């Protein structure tokens, strides 16, 4: 079957992408690793010994970065609907985050340990129809914020991929009510044509 012009363009962009080449060189599973590395360089959200939850983790780029920083004393719980090859000392839970049973399994894996940081690079399968994609993306963001509100220690941080559009302003307001400081980040490694940004919320206020 002949490839469409769109898929041909994506393949050319992918293989010409310097971050794809860097990921291959540096041993990262995904170019997305560099988005987290850029944010880490600027904001220092990861530290040795932390307990971290990584949502939308597959294929494991963010988990690799996180694991390398938090080290042996740290704890990382990762989850995705897709399979992910194992990473040493990472607890992985496969399943649909929107399902109550999977949400409960993540909470069970966390247990009574206070979480220092929740990170999420989740996104729904995009149809290209913004009116359909945006609500689905925001629903994932809302679930992630709900999880963060349940498991973060006071003073903990939250980083999430989010798309500008319907529901964004309300979400931003909700995050400001829950955290001391909320900032937006657009890493250089995020593709120019992408609407994605990252919301960084610091200083969870707790109950």
Swiss-Prot record:
GO biological process: RNA methylation
Pfam family, one: FtsJ
Keyword annotations from UniProtKB, A to Z: Cytoplasm, Methyltransferase, rRNA processing, S-adenosyl-L-methionine, Transferase
Record-listed S-adenosyl-L-methionine binding positions: 60, 62, 80, 96, 121
Domain of life: Bacteria
Cellular compartments annotated: Cytoplasm
Reactions mediated catalytically: uridine(2552) in 23S rRNA + S-adenosyl-L-methionine = 2'-O-methyluridine(2552) in 23S rRNA + S-adenosyl-L-homocysteine + H(+)
Transmembrane listed as a keyword: no
Catalytic class of the enzyme: transferase
GO molecular function, one term: rRNA (uridine-2'-O-)-methyltransferase activity
GO CC terms: cytoplasm
Cited InterPro entries: RNA_methyltr_RlmE, RNA_MeTrfase_FtsJ_dom, rRNA-MeTfrase_E, SAM-dependent_MTases_sf
Keyword match Acyltransferase: no
Sequence intervals crossing the membrane: none
Database matches in PANTHER family: RIBOSOMAL RNA METHYLTRANSFERASE, RRNA METHYLTRANSFERASE 2, MITOCHONDRIAL
Function, as annotated: Specifically methylates the uridine in position 2552 of 23S rRNA at the 2'-O position of the ribose in the fully assembled 50S ribosomal subunit.
Protein name as it appears in the record: Ribosomal RNA large subunit methyltransferase E
């Amino acid at each position: 079957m002949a490839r469409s012009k769109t898929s041909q363009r994506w393949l050319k962009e992918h293989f010409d992408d310097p971050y794809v080449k860097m990921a291959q060189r540096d041993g990262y599973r995904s170019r997305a690793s560099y988005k987290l590395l850029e944010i880490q360089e600027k904001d220092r959200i990861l530290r040795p010994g932390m307990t971290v939850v990584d949502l939308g983790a597959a294929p494991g780029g963010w988990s690799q970065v996180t694991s390398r920083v938090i080290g042996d004393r740290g704890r990382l719980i990762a989850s995705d609907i897709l399979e992910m090859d194992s990473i040493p000392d990472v607890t992985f839970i496969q399943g649909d985050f929107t399902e109550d049973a999977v949400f409960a399994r993540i909470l069970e894996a966390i247990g009574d340990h206070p979480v220092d940081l929740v990170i999420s690079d989740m996104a729904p399968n995009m149809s290209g129809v913004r009116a359909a994609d945006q609500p689905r993306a925001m629903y994932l963001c809302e679930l992630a914020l709900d999880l963060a509100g349940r498991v973060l220690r006071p003073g903990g941080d939250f980083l999430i991929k989010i798309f500008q559009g319907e529901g964004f302003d309300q979400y931003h307001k909700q995050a400001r009510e829950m955290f001391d400081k909320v900032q937006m980040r657009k890493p250089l490694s995020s593709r120019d044509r992408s609407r994605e940004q990252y919301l960084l919320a610091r200083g969870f206020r707790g109950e």
